[in-house]
Swiss-Prot record:
Disulfide pattern: C24-C93, C26-C122, C36-C147, C150-C197, C155-C160, C168-C189
This protein's name: Metalloproteinase inhibitor 1
Annotated segments matching region Involved in metalloproteinase-binding: 24-27, 90-91
SUPFAM superfamilies to which the protein is assigned, alphabetical: TIMP-like
Localisation: Secreted
Subunit and interaction comment: Interacts with MMP1, MMP3, MMP10 and MMP13, but has only very low affinity for MMP14. Interacts with CD63; identified in a complex with CD63 and ITGB1.
Alphabetized UniProt keyword annotations: Disulfide bond, Glycoprotein, Growth factor, Metal-binding, Metalloenzyme inhibitor, Metalloprotease inhibitor, Phosphoprotein, Protease inhibitor, Secreted, Signal, Zinc
Residue stretches making up the NTR domain: 24-147
Annotated organism of origin: Ovis aries (Sheep)
Molecular-function annotations in GO: cytokine activity; growth factor activity; metalloendopeptidase inhibitor activity; protease binding; zinc ion binding
PANTHER family xrefs: METALLOPROTEASE INHIBITOR, METALLOPROTEINASE INHIBITOR 1
């Protein structure tokens, strides 16, 4: 396996691509949206440092997967994921993993390309222990129930209204200025009856 040492041509190419440099910007999704829109959702530890491929302009991280929540059918006969791929530069939404704790588990939601798991700065990547118990329950079993019929509809400014009875109005950003408000940490948009979805608590019944 070859790591990709920078060359003069590679450095010049990077400088050309990043001038003028523009920061990657994206709106963080509700966790349910991240689950539903991702092809693969796993829990894993980052166990290796980034390896940069100067030709393809990507970097990859070695991981140790501990649990898969979504992606069994997409991965078919190769369910074990050992590497995650991302653009090599933050200006084009490359993800840079900054935690040095190799025993820390992360929830990672990404897309498949040629059998490889890809993520960006805009992907949902979060320390497992930082997530609420409701979010962990959502990724484990509940969010999937809303993927086919329901849509989390972000509301970031007034006025905003639902465009469909299958939409749930997400107001965390509007009310708290954060994407990590009550609806994000404790609720899921799930079918209430045919043709209608509502916010529902992710707390276990009886809790």
């Amino acid at each position: 396996m070859a790591l990709f040492a920078p060359t003069v041509s590679g450095i010049l190419l990077l400088l050309w691509l990043t001038a003028p440099s523009r920061a990657c910007t994206c709106v963080p999704p509700h966790p349910q949206t991240a689950f539903c829109n991702s092809e693969v959702v796993i829990r894993a530890k980052f166990v290796g440092t980034a390896e940069v491929n100067e030709t393809a302009l990507y970097q990859r991280y070695e991981i140790k997967m501990t649990k898969m929540f979504k992606g069994f059918s997409a991965l078919r006969d190769a369910p074990d994921i050992r590497f995650i791929y991302t653009p090599a530069m933050e200006s084009v939404c490359g993800y840079f993993h900054r935690s040095q704790n190799r025993s820390e588990e992360f929830l990672i939601a990404g897309q498949l390309s040629n059998g490889h798991l890809h993520i960006t700065t805009c992907s949902f990547v979060a320390p497992w222990n930082s997530m609420s118990s409701a979010q962990r329950r959502g990724f484990t079993k509940t969010y999937a129930a809303g993927c086919e019929e329901c849509t989390v509809f972000p509301c970031s400014s007034i006025p905003c209204k639902l465009q469909s009875d299958t939409h749930c109005l997400w107001t965390d950003q509007l009310l708290t200025g954060s994407d990590k408000g009550f609806q994000s940490r404790h609720l899921a948009c799930l079918p209430r009856e045919p043709g209608m979805c509502t916010w529902q608590s992710l707390r276990p019944r009886g809790a």
